[in-house]
Amino acid sequence: MTSLLAAELKPQQLIHKSREEEESQAKAKMVRSINPKKAKRKNKKKGEASSSASVPSMPTRVWQPGVDKLEEGEELQCDPSAYNSLHGFHVGWPCLSFDILGDKLGLNRTEFPHTLYMVAGTQAEKAPLNSIGLFKISNVSGKRRDVVPKTVVNGDDAMEDEDDEDEDSDSDEESEDGASTTPIIQVRRVAHHGCVNRIRAMPQNPHICVSWADSGHVQVWDMSSHLNALAESETEGKDGTSPALNHAPLVNFSGHKDEGYAIDWSPATAGRLLSASGSWTVDPIPLTGHTASVEDLQWSPAEANVFASCSVDGTIALWDVRVGKTPALSFKAHNADVNVISWNRLASCMLASGSDDGAFSIHDLRVIKEGDAKVAHFEYHKHPITSIEWSAHESSTLAVSSGDNQLTIWDLSLEKDEEEEAEFKAQTKEYVNTPQDLPPQLLFVHQGQKDLKELHWHNQIPGMIISTAEDGFNILMPYNIQNTLPDLAA
């Protein structure tokens, strides 16, 4: 059985708006081509009441991280109307990596509340304190666009500033029918010696997971017993976690000379696994081709024997495991370390890459031999790109996380339409002045997490993204992201 411990998430109390105001703002978000998250400025002074009558009516201005500065006494305020759903939680120690587990609850789930499963590995202060966590997160509510603040399990940090006490709630949020909208989190923990640099679940058999430890060991685990226990457990409105259980891995590979991060299961061939480290070796056949450490690997979604790798040497290499031990193609992708890559599952000719200088690029693999395959390049982020992933539901949409504490969502099909914007601005009393240098493909900006490490789209819940950072996890569903599956037959 899963033992239960109290680790309750408390939703943040929000200022309620009238239905007319919400509908007006919703229409504004849907019509605009550029929809970054609105960040409101709030100058808080104790003892002073706010008065809208004394403030002249002015257009809202988009606040740009790394460009605009906050004055003393100012802070950014989350706009909950920008989300269909937003929740946050902390598991004690930070998690560098996680993966969303496929389930049997349905392929196209759009109705709240949602239930999801995931696996994550910790980065604890001492090696014996680390573990792999199997998560069942249920009652993930939405539509009210409720925000859940960070929950601190260890330490003396307060959940909220004392100035925000009037916005907190000590009781569960309830929907109109009286049901709780607080997510319920249950965790089964497996002891893992050392920090987990990267963890991935096999797409065909999600109970089979592989972890890469900072010790250099790659271990394959069968987590079926723990997932079955979570699936059969009754939440009854309670969060819960188990003590770290001893569980022997199926395989313990120690062939790498040092630690690494690059690891990937094949989506086409069950059980086929790639791993690469600073010494660039792949189990079980060593391959050579990069002049520096390999940072990420991705199997092709369309060809069972082809994969891509990226490296600190600034290159991306394409490999065919049937042909020799050197890359079939290699090209210069960035002028800095290439940290992450993502292969588009809906348009397999497109590969995205993110670099250490904050830039990310889109490469068309059909034209590599003809010259520069780069079809798009963005320098919006100010710090290294830490994660990048194409949407499983929209071929032109991808999400990016960076060390600048931003998670951004991009739609490459968008173009700036000045005539449409001018017409919209003339018809709308409340509008946002868009910075001229803001890329028209930037669809959404999510902030509020510190030192973002990794993000993933949920393949079975369109529009849902989960991200991990130094201060915990966020589950978000932006309001302007399509929440239906594409018509693949079209």
Feature names for model-found ranges:
Residues 102-105, 111-114, 203-205, 267-269, ...:
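Residue-level detector of Asp-centered blade-edge/turn motifs that repeat once per structural unit
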Residues 138-141, 177-179, 215-250, 257, ...:
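Per-blade loop-tip surfaces of WD-repeat and WD-like beta-propellers in eukaryotic adaptors/scaffolds
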Residues 32, 88-101, 190-196, 297, ...:
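Repeat-based blade/solenoid architectures
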Residues 397, 401-409, 439, 444-470:
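C-terminal transmembrane module of eukaryotic multi-pass membrane proteins
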Residues 4-5, 29-99, 104-188, 216-246, ...:
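Beta-propeller domains
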Residues 94, 114, 128, 195, ...:
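Beta-rich catalytic cores
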